[in-house]
Structures are given as structure tokens and as C-alpha cells.
Swiss-Prot record:
This is Probable E3 ubiquitin-protein ligase HECTD2. GO terms for biological process: protein polyubiquitination. Keywords: Phosphoprotein, Transferase, Ubl conjugation pathway. GO terms for cellular component: cytosol. The active site is at C744. Residues 437-776 form the HECT domain. It comes from Homo sapiens (Human).
Amino acid sequence: MSEAVRVPSPATPLVVAAPAPEERKGKESEREKLPPIVSAGAGATAGLDRGAKGQISTFSSFISAVSPKKEAAENRSSPAHLVFPNIKNVREPPPICLDVRQKQRTSMDASSSEMKAPVLPEPILPIQPKTVKDFQEDVEKVKSSGDWKAVHDFYLTTFDSFPELNAAFKKDATASFNTIEDSGINAKFVNAVYDTLLNTPQDVQKTVLKGIINSLLREWKGPRTKDDLRAYFILLQNPQFNNTSTYVIYAHLLRQIATLVEADHHFLVHWFKKLSQKRFKQLVERLLQFISLRLFPAKPEEFPPITKCSWWIPSAAKVLALLNTANNLVHPPLIPYTDFYNSTLDHIDLMEEYHTWQNFGNSHRFSFCQYPFVISVAAKKIIIQRDSEQQMINIARQSLVDKVSRRQRPDMNILFLNMKVRRTHLVSDSLDELTRKRADLKKKLKVTFVGEAGLDMGGLTKEWFLLLIRQIFHPDYGMFTYHKDSHCHWFSSFKCDNYSEFRLVGILMGLAVYNSITLDIRFPPCCYKKLLSPPIIPSDQNIPVGICNVTVDDLCQIMPELAHGLSELLSHEGNVEEDFYSTFQVFQEEFGIIKSYNLKPGGDKISVTNQNRKEYVQLYTDFLLNKSIYKQFAAFYYGFHSVCASNALMLLRPEEVEILVCGSPDLDMHALQRSTQYDGYAKTDLTIKYFWDVVLGFPLDLQKKLLHFTTGSDRVPVGGMADLNFKISKNETSTNCLPVAHTCFNQLCLPPYKSKKDLKQKLIIGISNSEGFGLE
């Protein structure tokens, strides 16, 4: 390992705030007891031990689920049709299932194509009864004749067994289709049959459900063939499972899929990723709905007692994990990762879920924390904050006990992280204070500016963050380079003797998360991926931190021009060696001096050719994003994790860490209007009406400037606009004056302008020229 990528020794200031080796070792041994955060490649049975696996005790109730007394329920609008709102503004790890939690997650791509599982001989299938065209013609005939017999007979035969399902929907009944890339299913035919099903008479729909019951009973035991997997794949898409009256059947289908072996899950995952976006999203929404209505049933009497079906939710969560992994294997994903959030979970006891997960070694109980992709970022923030609060309370309690045991008078200041800094020496004072008080980093933060009166009720803390961030990220400071093309900062590769200020930035980000402060920082997504590599500080100091697999796409988020050039090199159809005349040596300017670096031993003598260009691009990208800034980023990493040393970080995706630190880029000005408070104005006053007419009509860039002008950031906290506590105050000055913002209190002081035109003009001038005016 070269010097550039060596982990700093324990004697360096980088790890001064990290836990002691003995403490880390103890914590690491505790974390080994945690259940793995489930990926589709993992075992299928997590949490399924709540219910009996050897028998299907509730299948006897299947028939009652489709009996005539349920017809009214099937016809009316069911709670199962509600659509859960996605938490917007918010790729596990890709962030969750692919590469961020290396110890907990398994990429499906890492598995071999056949998983080395024995391929069972496929049974001889019945003769395929109809084609898509035949089925559609039968449906058309019904419109004129009203006779459903042909359609009824088709559904009766098709859903009677797994072989019949394959006979109906397999592209070629004689072909095996034992590959992960092609399920062999005629998707168009499946979609046509299911789209028609909900418009058929009730007796046809009951016939299908009874056929599924028979199929599941018949196929409950024994090894699975690929035809069995195809049948599960087809049945899972049945839209009848939107109705709560079918949930008993649906639950047993989910359990059979969840308990398949890993090799079978591997096939299903790759088949799922071939679904259309519409059908894929329907599967996800149906499963989320199933979990929500099992947790909070509109009519509890529709379901078996929870004690007899405690395996329902674990089974659904496991199948969701398969879909989540499939989604992460597609670039871009079929649906946004936020579509997997289940907002219903925001209303359960999240800390109980978290503690169950933490204590898994003792209880082996199911916890949603094993499936963090269904937990919204807002819910994860609650878990992190409450976990940190508990840590703060424990530290403060120990401090009080120590004081009392020494017969010293307790000082309430020991409950806080008290920062005393001079404005003229902001960075050095802050660094000194945080270094001296590294044991107090998890306490509530309070800031005092030396020589200034006033209590910190939140405003001074926010001002300290804003001033410090602006100073550290200023180009003249030299720690970070601002890339105009990508509008983001990246770590300077300049070598120095002390990287403690990078540790300070990491601590600031950690404190911001724990103290609910939104920072005006612009790092690329790659930064947060590195920050979770690994999500917990390793006990072995020799293990590199902040190193992750990077691609040209990651580089494009920082240096788009260079990334474009490397992409052209990869796609060049001519002779790369003659046309580009490059070697495995790169150059960087440091303080006006050009320095050369070999990407591999003897790189200056190795030409880039058509054969090795992929290696060159990978090494160059890795050099820029990992090796050349290793010491800087390691200091930053240790700083962040010295504050955020919590297992809760294992629940987060890189994008979610960014949202916790910087807020969401998606604005909802109507929500801001609803939550705004007024001082000196009423929301019915003419000036206020003018203000909102103007602001709601602003283009997005001006709305962001307004938010930045009034709050110090153009992003929204995790809790939404309401968490800003935005206030408009009446400024009793001349209407010739511009609006004034008290950034630390998210307050806008607005003169009583007499016309909308005047207000718009003054507001645009104010928000467009606020840089350099300083904080008020």
C-alpha cells in the first residue's frame, strides 16, 4: 500500500475523537450480534420464525375469504386501494443492497449466473390452451354475447396448477428457459389476462382464487423447478391481491416465495428487473399496502388474530427486499428508492424496532430495521436523534454522578457542549474547543461568542455553523475546490502536515445531524458514499476508511469535462495508443508545481491501449476520488464518526445522509405559506397577499434564492417546510428600503409595500444581491 492510502497512525490527531481501541473492540463485538440488514442475496427466513413453517394452519379459512358473503366487500372500494404518499425530497446500500454495507449486504451481481444449484427436470407441461390473440377475441365476443363461459373456462384451467400456469404463459412450453436473464414468460399475455380479470364476474374471480389455493397447497413442499419459480412470479402480479379479502391467500404466497432458497431468489430478482416500470411499481405498492393494513387494519375482523399470522409482515418484507435489490440492479432504477418508503411506519414505535434489532442476538425477533429501505428518511432521523439523545443523557448522567461522588457542586453546564469562540479566530477557536471537549460531542450544542451578551436559544448555534462553513469553504482557504460545472466542492489534493481542519468539517457535519441544523454544503453524492465506507469505524486501525468503488459516473458528478473525456477514450473506435498517446501516469498541479503520479508501478512506461484502457480509466478515477485525497478524507471521516458513532448509520443510504446534513432540494412553497408565522402582520393583510402572489409565481431559481436569503440554505429540512419555523415580521421603515433577513432565526423583515410591483422589485433586488452582506 502506498503512503497516500495508508491509514494514519493512532498518534496522529485524526483519530483523537474516535473511540479508544478497547471501546471500539467492545462495540464491534456487540455489532456482530446485530442481524444482517437484509439483501435479496441473504437467507430468506429472517423473522419468519414467528409462524409455523411445517403446516398451513389458516388455509382452511381460504374458502371463507372468497365466499359469497364477501361479494359486497369485493365490489366496494376497499382500504386496500389507498395510495400511500411518498416522502419526497429526500441510490444501501447501492447504498443499501450493493456496496455501502459490505459486511451486511450481498450484491446479486456477485452471484454466479446459475448459483451452482441443481437444475431439477421440468415436468411435461399441458398443451397451451390459447394464444394472446385467442384470449382477446374471447373477451371481445363477451361484449356482444354476454356469455363468459369461454373466458371462465380459460381462467379455471390456467390457475388450477403451476404446470397449467406455465402452459398458458410460457413463450415456448418445450423450452427450459433456465437463465436469469429471461423468465420465458409472455409478459404481454400475463398483463392482458390480469387487466381483464378485475372486470369479470365474481364467479370467475373466485375461480381464480380457488385455483391459487389449490396450487399453493399442492406446491407447499418439495424442491422447486424453474417452472415453479415462473408460477410464483406470475401469481405475485395478480391484482386481486389489492383487496383485503384475499390477504390470507396473498400471505401464504408471500411466505412460500420468502422461504425459497437463495439460488431461486437470484432468478426471481433478475426476472423482477425485467418488468415494466408500471408493473414493478404495482408490486411494490401492493406489498407496502399489505404491511400497512396488517399493522393498522381498517377492519380487524377481516384478518386472523395477529398471534396466528405474525409471519405475514416478515414474509412481505423479504419479498420487498427482492424487489429492492432488483431495482438497484437497474441503472437508472425502475422506480425512485423513495417509492419503497412505507409512511405507515412513521407511526409505530420506531425505537422499539431499533432496540429489537440491536438486541437481535437475544431475541431473534423481526425488526423493520433489518429492511431499512422501507423506513423513510424522516423516520430514520427520529431513530438517530433519539439514539443520540439517549447517548447524551447517559453521558450527562455519568458526569453528574462523577461530580456528586467527588462531593462537588453539580453544574448544569455539564449537560451541554458549550463552545466559546471569538469571531476573529473562528476556525482555530472552534478546532481547539472541539478537540478539548471531544468527550462532550454528543451533548446538546450551545455557542457563545466571546465579548457578546445573549443566550443561545438556537440562533447563535446556527450562526456559528453558517459562519464557520462559509469561512472553511471559501476558495482562499484552500481546503476545498469549487467546481463550477458541477456546482459542488471537492477535497483539495494538496499535501499538508496537519489535516485536523478536515476533521473539524466532519465534526461539524456530525453535529449538524445531531442538532437538527441544515448546512449549506455542496458535496457530490460520491462523498456520502465514501462517508459510509464503512458505516461504523473499524476496530482495526490498519483498515482503510472512506474508500469505495468509484466509476466514471461518480467522477462526472464532480468533474464532468474530465469524465466526458474518459468516456470518449473508452468508446474510441480508432487506435487508442496512437491517437491519445497516453501512459499510466497522471499530472496534478500543487502550489504552482506540476507533479506526476504513476497509476501503477512503472506507469510512466506503460502506454494506454485499446486493451488496457478500461483499467486506465478505473485507476485514474480511483486516484482522483480515493487515493489522492485519502488523508484528507480519512480525517473528515473520523471527524464525522466521532460524533455519529451509532449503529443507526447502518440504516442510511448515502443520499439520506446528504439529506440529513444538507436538507432536500425539492421545494414546496405552498407548504411554506401554510406554516409561516407572522409578527406585526396578519395573513390576510394586503402586503402578505402580495408577497405570496409574487413568491408562488417565482421561477424555481428565485424561490431558492429567497430561501437562501432568509434561512442561509436553499434546501428544506427532513421534516419539510414546517420545520423551518419561517416568520415574516413587519419592518416599520420606509417602503423604499429592501427586505432584511435574520438568517439565524429564519425571519424575513418586510416593509409594508403598497403595491405588488414595488414588493416584487424590492424582493428580487434583495434576494439577488445578498451575498457578502453578512449575517443579521
